[in-house]
Amino acid sequence: MTNMAETKDTVQLRLLSLELLKQLWAGHEAMCQSVTRAASESNLDYSSSSNNLEMPLSQETSASSVAPNSQDKRHVWDPLDSHRGDTYDVAWYGKVNSRVDSLPPATCQHQEPQEGLRPSSVPLLATEGLKRPVSLGGPKGLGPDKAQVPRSLPLRLGKLSKPKVTFSQESSVPESSWYSRPCLDYDWTAGSLDSSSPVSSESEAYFSMLQRFREDNREDCVCNSPEAVFPELQESSGVEEDHECVYCYRINRRLFPEPLDPGAPCCLCGIPRDEQGPQTLVEPVQVRVSIPLSIMDPPHQYRIHRRKSFDASDTFALPRHCLLGWDILPPKSEKTSVPKSLDLWSSVSHGAAQRRNLSATNPSYQALRSRVPPPFWSEPQVARLCPSH
C-alpha cells in the first residue's frame, strides 16, 4: 500500500510540474511577442526619421523568438519516462516559474532607444538571453547555482548593447551647380582658365571638311621656302647689297674678341656669320663689341704686398701691368743711410757704398748701372799765390 501511495504522489507531482512547464512556455511566448512588437514599433519610428539606417529586423526577431521555443520544447519529457526521486525538480520549477512570471512586467515595458544605439539589437539580446535559462534539470541533474541565469537578463541588455555609428550617404551634386559652391585655391585657378575652346566643340564633319580643303589647296596652305623660317628677311629685301654686316662680339680676358653666336645672322641682310666668304679675313667686317666691366675695372684692388700672388706674364690687362712696375723700384732708404753731414767727400763715399749694396741685392740695378756711366768726381784745385821777391 505504501508503494502504491508513493507512486500516486509521484505521478501527481509530475502532472503538476507539467502544468507549471506549460505556464512557463506561455510566459515565454508572451514576453517574446511583447519584445518583438516593441522592437518593430521602434524600428518604424526610427526609420521614418533617418533614411540611411538599416531596415528593421522584424522578421529576424520573430524567427529568433520562435527558435528558443522550439529549442526549449526539446527539454520537455514524458512524466512516465522519468525516474524516481525528482521531488527537488518540482520545487526548482516553482522557483523558475515565479521568477519568469516576475520578468514580463519589467521586460515588456518599452523604453525609447537612446541616441546612437541600434534599436534592432534589443530583440536579439532579449531572445538570446531567453535561450539559456530554459535548460531545465533533467536526468543530468543541474544544480541550483546554474538556475540563476534569468536574473542576469537585464544586466546583459545593459552590458552587451554597444553603440553603432552610421554615416549618411553623400548626395550626388550635379555639375551645373559646381560653380556656385565655394572652391579651394586650385579649384579657383582651374576655374579661371579658359578651357572652353570653340574648336573642341566642333563636330567630326568640320575637321574632315578642313582636311579635304587642305589637301586640295596644299600649295597655298604649306610653304617650304626658307623665308618662312625667318619672316624678317622679307622686310630686309630693300637693303643695299654693299652694306657692312654687323655681328656681336665679346672681349675675353686676354682682350681678344669672341663671337657671341657664330650662327647668328646679320641684323641687316640676315646672312649668318659662319657663311661669310674668305674676303672677310682680308677686309674685316665691322663688329659690335661688348666689354665686360671686370676687364676694364677690376672689382677688387690689388695690394702692393700681394703683387706676387698672381702671374701677370700672360695678360694684357692694364692694372696688372702697372703692378709689375713695383718689382723694379729700388728699396726704400733706411734711417741709418741718411748722411749725418753735408760734407761733399762723405756724401760721395756714402753713395758709393749704397751703390755697392744695391748691386749686390738687385740685379736689375746692375744692368741699369752698366748703361749709365758713373759720375766723375774730381778733387778741387786751389790756386796758390807765390810771394814776390
Swiss-Prot record:
Transmembrane segments: none annotated. The keyword Phosphoprotein applies. Residues 71-80 have a biased composition (Basic and acidic residues). Residues 44-54 have a biased composition (Low complexity). Residues 58-70 have a biased composition (Polar residues). It comes from the Eukaryota. It holds the Pfam family MIIP. The modification Phosphoserine is found at S309. InterPro entries: MIIP. Residues 44-80, 131-150 are annotated as: Disordered. GO terms for biological process: negative regulation of cell migration; negative regulation of G2/M transition of mitotic cell cycle. Keywords: Phosphoprotein. Interacts with IGFBP2. PANTHER family: MIGRATION AND INVASION-INHIBITORY PROTEIN (PTHR34831:SF1). Inhibits glioma cells invasion and down-regulates adhesion- and motility-associated genes such as NFKB2 and ICAM1. Exhibits opposing effects to IGFBP2 on cell invasion. This is Migration and invasion-inhibitory protein. It comes from Rattus norvegicus (Rat). The lineage of its organism: Eukaryota, Metazoa, Chordata, Craniata, Vertebrata.
